[in-house]
């Protein structure tokens, strides 16, 4: 086995996935940036959730907004719903794993807030339930998916934004999700700070 060639192939595949995605995803990413920025300017907040690697992505996103991305600026209201082990285990034990995010959305979300819902497959039950809860609270949903968008792609409303990576391999989708998250953070900063 030629490990160097294998590593190089992974780099090439990852780069190609991102290049394949740009034409399809640039406009909805720009729309998501504008929607998120308007939410934050008007005193709203962004709740983010996902499972596994997508949980890490939701935490990464919230950290970039609360702290900073690449430029100093005021703190921005973002909460990752994946971090409180007591809440997650209490809801998972007393209700079900499918409700670990939806109950938090109902408790923390308000009209005008945004749910950033991350699911590589678009079929995660607890993300689907979180989206339903967000819709109940008149929140916008920005869904970050792959593999055609799954059930999540089918349940989004006209005011929601679907950022679907045109790929089927989980690793490539996750790598592109991170790039999308960085694009969101960069765009929010550009609008808030007036950067060209």
Curated annotation (Swiss-Prot):
UniProt cross-references to Pfam families, sorted A to Z: SIS_2
Residues binding Zn(2+), per UniProt: 60, 64, 174, 182
UniProt catalytic activity: 2 D-sedoheptulose 7-phosphate = D-glycero-alpha-D-manno-heptose 7-phosphate + D-glycero-beta-D-manno-heptose 7-phosphate
Binding site for substrate: 51-53, 64, 93-94, 119-121, 124, 174
Ranges where the SIS domain occurs: 36-196
GO terms for cellular component: cytoplasm
UniProt similarity note: Belongs to the SIS family. GmhA subfamily.
Note from the entry: The reaction produces a racemic mixture of D-glycero-alpha-D-manno-heptose 7-phosphate and D-glycero-beta-D-manno-heptose 7-phosphate.
Role description: Catalyzes the isomerization of sedoheptulose 7-phosphate in D-glycero-D-manno-heptose 7-phosphate.
NCBIfam families on file: PRK13936.1 (NF010546)
Name of the protein: Phosphoheptose isomerase
Gene name for this UniProt entry: gmhA
């Amino acid at each position: 086995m030629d490990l160097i060639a294998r590593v190089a192939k992974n780099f090439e595949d990852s780069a190609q996935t991102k290049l394949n995605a740009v034409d399809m995803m640039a406009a909805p990413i720009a729309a998501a940036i504008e929607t998120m920025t308007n939410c934050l300017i008007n005193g709203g907040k962004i709740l983010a959730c996902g499972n596994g690697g997508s949980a890490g992505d939701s935490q990464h996103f919230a950290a970039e907004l609360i702290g900073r991305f690449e430029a100093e600026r005021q703190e921005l209201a973002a909460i990752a719903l994946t971090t409180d082990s007591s809440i997650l285990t209490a809801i998972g034990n007393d209700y079900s794993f499918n409700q670990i995010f939806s109950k938090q959305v109902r408790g923390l979300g308000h009209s005008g807030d945004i749910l950033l819902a991350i699911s590589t497959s678009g079929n995660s039950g607890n993300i689907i339930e979180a989206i339903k809860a967000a819709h109940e609270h008149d929140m916008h949903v920005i869904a970050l998916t792959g593999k055609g968008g799954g059930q999540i792609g089918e349940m989004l409303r006209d005011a929601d934004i679907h950022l679907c990576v045109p790929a089927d391999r989980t690793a490539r989708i996750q790598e592109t999700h991170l790039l999308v998250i960085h694009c969101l953070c960069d765009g929010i900063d550009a609008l808030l700070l007036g950067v060209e």
